[in-house]
C-alpha cells in the first residue's frame, strides 16, 4: 500500500521518479507527489488525483535536480487532498519526507512539537517525522544523528526516505514493518517500496530488514541498526525479473496478461521446485501438527493446501488467517508445530507478523513466496518460491495457481514418504501447463457468458471438499474487480441457510469435477436449480449439462489438481465482467496489491 521512489545520480531526478511512480500505481493510491533538490533549494509538487493528471496539471517533470523522492499515498491519517499528499516538510522547508506505514504515537509527538513552536500544515502522521527531525537537528547539528534520534522516538510502521536541502548528495532511509529496497546502478542509486519502480535501470538490489536505517549516495550506501548504530553487512540480490515481464506486452490489462501467463508460470513453478519440495517434505515429516496461514487469495491457497497435505501426508492441518493467528494462537504455537506461511509479496503485514510470532515460540517456518529477498524469505527457515514473475494486477491470478502448484508438489512428496500412491497426480503434474492452456482457449466463450450475466447483482459460488476454496476464490475475484456481491459457499451448507437466498435468476456457479463429492455436488446444483437459480457449472461429467443453464466443460483431471485448472475460467469471468462494467481490473477501488500495514 502506497509507493515510494527515491533517486540520486546523473539523471534528471523528476524523470526517474515519475516513471517509478507509474510503475507503482498497482499498489493503490489516491494522491501523489515528488520533491527534488537543486542548488540547495527544495522543489515540491503534489496533489490528489492520478499521476498522469498530476504530471500535466502540476508540471512534475519541470522540477530540476539530480536527487529527489516521490510518493503515491493511500490515505490513513487525513483525507486524500493536496495538503495531505506527500512529500511533507518541516518548518524550514529544508527537510522533506516520504513515508509508507502508520506512526502510532504521532498525536503524542505532535503535541510535544506544537509546544515547541512547530507549525503543522497537514493532518497526516508523516509530517510529524519531518518536524521531529528538524527538532533533533537543532540539538545535534548532525544529519545522521538527528535522523536516528527521530527514528528511536517513532512507534508503528514505516518505510522512510528523507532528503535534506543542506545535505544534497545523500538520501536517508529506514525501515520498520514496511518494505524498502535499494536498487544499485552504476554511479546512481534508487530506493523504492517495490522492485518494478527501478527495474528499467538495474536488477541489483539490497533489501532493508526491519530496524535498519541507511545513508545512500550515488556511489555507495551504508546500512546500520537503528537501536545500536552498528554497521550491517548486506547481501546484494540479482533480480531475475526483466522489465518486459513487468509490462503489458500488448494485452489490454495486466490482469489478462497474467491470466494468460499461467501455463509458463506453472511450468516454472514445477521445475523450480524439483529439488526443494522433497527437502521441505522431509522437514514436515518431523511434525505431528502443521499450521498454514495467509491472507486473501493466499488464505484460499492455504485451504487447498490443507486438503492436499491431509490427504497425502496423513497429518492434521490447521488453516487460519494470519490476522487471526497472530492474536488467537499465541498460547498454542510451540516447537511441536510447523508453520507454512503463504505470501505473494513476502511483505504482507499480518503474515509477516504471524511468522515472527511463530519464530519467537520456537516454531519452524516454511515460506511459500514469490518475491526473492523479501522479508518473509529472510524470516523463514525454508522457502519454496512460486517463480510466477512480477504480478502487477491487484487481483492475484498466476501467483495463486503457482502457490497451488507448490503445495501440490509438497503434498505429493509427503505422500511418497508415508507410502501413499501418488502415481496419478505425479503423472499429471507435468501436463498442468497444457491443461491450463486448454482452459484459456475458452476465453471467448467466457466473455459471452459475462455478457449474459452483466446485469446480475448477486452471485453464489459453491463447491465441496478441495473445490470449496475454488468457490471462495472465484467469488473473491468477482468482488475485487467487478464490484458485485458474491459469496463462496460450501455446497453442503446450502440447506443450512443460504438456500433461502436463491431465487429466480440468481447465478449459482457450481465447481463440480469428477471426484468423491461429485454426486453430492450434482444434488446441490439440482437443489439450487429447483429454487430458480441460474446454474453455471464447471466440470467434466455430461450429467451437469442436463441440470445447468450454462455448462463449461473442462478436461478431466485428478480431483487434487482441479483447483489449479478450474480457477482459470473463473478468473476470466471476473475479468470480463469488470471490463464490461467499465472498471479497470488492474487497479480496483479501495484495494492495494501488497497490504503492508495492519
Swiss-Prot record:
Residues 2-219 form the Glutamine amidotransferase type-2 domain. GO terms for cellular component: cytoplasm. It is found in: Cytoplasm. Transmembrane segments: none annotated. GO terms for molecular function: carbohydrate derivative binding; glutamine-fructose-6-phosphate transaminase (isomerizing) activity. The active site is at 2 (nucleophile), 593 (for fru-6p isomerization activity). GO terms for biological process: carbohydrate metabolic process; fructose 6-phosphate metabolic process; protein N-linked glycosylation; UDP-N-acetylglucosamine metabolic process. It holds the Pfam family SIS. Residues 280-420, 449-588 form the SIS domain. Keywords: Aminotransferase, Cytoplasm, Glutamine amidotransferase, Repeat, Transferase. Homodimer. Catalyzes the first step in hexosamine metabolism, converting fructose-6P into glucosamine-6P using glutamine as a nitrogen source. This is Glutamine--fructose-6-phosphate aminotransferase [isomerizing]. The lineage of its organism: Archaea, Methanobacteriati, Methanobacteriota, Thermococci, Thermococcales. The gene is glmS.
Amino acid at each position: 500500500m502506497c509507493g515510494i521512489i527515491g533517486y540520486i545520480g546523473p539523471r534528471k531526478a523528476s524523470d526517474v521518479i515519475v516513471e517509478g511512480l507509474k510503475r507503482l500505481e498497482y499498489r493503490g493510491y489516491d494522491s501523489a507527489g515528488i520533491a527534488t533538490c537543486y542548488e540547495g533549494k527544495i522543489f515540491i509538487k503534489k496533489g490528489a488525483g492520478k499521476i498522469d493528471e498530476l504530471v500535466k496539471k502540476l508540471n512534475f517533470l519541470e522540477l530540476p535536480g539530480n536527487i529527489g523522492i516521490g510518493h503515491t499515498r493511500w490515505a490513513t491519517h487525513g483525507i486524500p487532498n493536496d495538503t495531505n499528499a506527500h512529500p511533507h516538510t518541516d518548518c524550514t522547508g529544508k527537510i522533506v519526507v516520504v513515508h509508507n506505514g502508520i506512526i502510532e504515537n504521532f498525536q503524542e509527538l505532535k503535541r510535544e512539537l506544537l509546544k515547541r513552536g512547530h507549525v503543522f500544515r497537514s493532518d497526516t502522521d508523516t509530517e510529524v517525522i519531518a518536524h521531529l527531525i528538524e527538532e533533533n537537528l537543532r540539538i545535534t547539528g548532525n544529519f545522521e544523528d538527528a535522523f536516528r534520534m527521530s527514528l528511536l522516538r517513532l512507534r508503528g510502521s514505516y518505510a522512510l526516505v528523507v532528503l535534506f536541502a543542506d545535505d544534497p548528495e545523500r538520501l536517508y532511509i529506514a525501515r520498520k514493518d514496511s518494505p524498502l529496497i535499494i536498487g544499485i546502478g552504476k554511479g546512481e542509486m534508487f530506493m523504492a517500496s517495490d522492485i518494478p519502480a527501478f527495474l528499467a535501470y538495474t536488477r541489483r538490489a539490497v533489501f532493508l530488514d526491519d530496524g535498519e536505517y541507511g545513508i545512500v549516495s550515488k556511489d555507495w550506501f551504508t546500512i546500520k541498526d537503528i537501536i545500536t548504530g552498528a554497521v550491517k553487512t548486506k547481501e546484494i540480490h540479482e533480480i531475475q525479473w526483466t522489465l518486459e515481464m513487468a509490462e503489458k506486452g500488448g494485452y489490454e490489462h495486466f490482469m489478462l496478461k497474467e491470466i494468460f501467463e499461467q501455463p509458463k508460470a506453472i511450468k516454472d513453478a514445477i521445475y523450480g521446485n524439483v529439488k526443494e519440495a522433497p527437502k521441505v517434505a522431509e522437514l514436515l515429516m518431523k511434525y505431528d501438527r502443521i499450521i498454514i496461514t495467509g491472507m486473501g487469495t493466499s488464505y484460499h491457497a492455504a485451504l487447498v493446501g490443507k486438503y492436499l497435505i491431509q490427504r497425502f501426508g496423513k497429518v492434521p492441518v490447521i488453516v487460519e488467517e494470519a490476522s487471526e493467528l497472530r492474536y488467537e494462537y499465541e498460547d498454542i504455537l510451540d516447537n511441536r508445530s510447523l508453520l507454512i506461511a503463504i505470501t505473494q509479496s513476502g511483505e504482507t503485514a499480518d503474515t509477516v507478523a504471524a511468522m515472527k510470532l511463530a519464530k519467537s515460540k520456537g516454531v519452524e517456518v516454511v515460506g511459500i513466496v514469490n518475491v526473492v529477498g523479501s522479508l518473509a524469505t529472510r524470516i523463514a527457515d525454508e522457502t519454496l518460491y512460486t517463480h510466477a514473475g512480477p504480478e502487477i494486477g491487484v487481483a492475484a491470478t498466476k501467483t495463486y495457481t503457482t502457490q497451488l502448484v507448490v503445495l501440490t508438489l509438497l503434498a505429493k512428496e509427503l505422500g511418497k514418504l508415508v507410502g501413499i500412491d501418488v502415481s496419478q497426480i505425479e503423472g499429471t503434474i507435468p501436463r498442468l501447463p497444457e491443461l491450463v492452456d486448454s482452459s484459456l482457449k475458452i476465453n471467448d466463450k467466457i466473455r459471452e457468458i459475462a455478457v449474459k450475466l452483466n446485469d446480475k447483482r448477486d452471485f453464489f459460488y459453491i463447491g465441496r471438499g478441495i473445490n470449496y476454496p475454488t468457490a471462495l476464490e472465484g467469488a473473491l475475484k468477482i468482488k475485487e474487480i467487478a464490484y458485485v456481491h458474491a459469496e463462496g459457499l460450501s455446497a453442503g451448507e446450502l440447506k443450512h441457510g443460504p438456500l433461502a437466498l436463491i431465487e429466480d435468476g440468481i447465478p449459482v456457479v457450481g465447481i463440480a469435477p469428477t471426484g468423491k463429492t461429485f454426486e453430492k455436488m450434482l444434488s446441490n446444483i439440482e437443489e439450487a436449480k429447483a429454487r430458480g437459480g441460474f446454474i453455471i457449472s464447471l466440470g467434466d461429467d455430461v450429467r451437469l449439462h442436463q441440470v445447468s443453464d450454462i455448462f463449461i466443460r473442462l478436461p478431466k483431471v485428478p480431483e487434487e489438481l482441479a483447483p489449479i485448472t478450474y480457477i482459470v475460467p473463473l478468473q476470466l469471468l471476473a475479468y470480463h465482467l469488470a471490463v464490461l462494467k467499465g472498471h479497470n481490473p488492474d487497479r480496483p477501488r479501495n484495494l492495494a496489491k501488497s497490504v503492508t500495514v495492519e
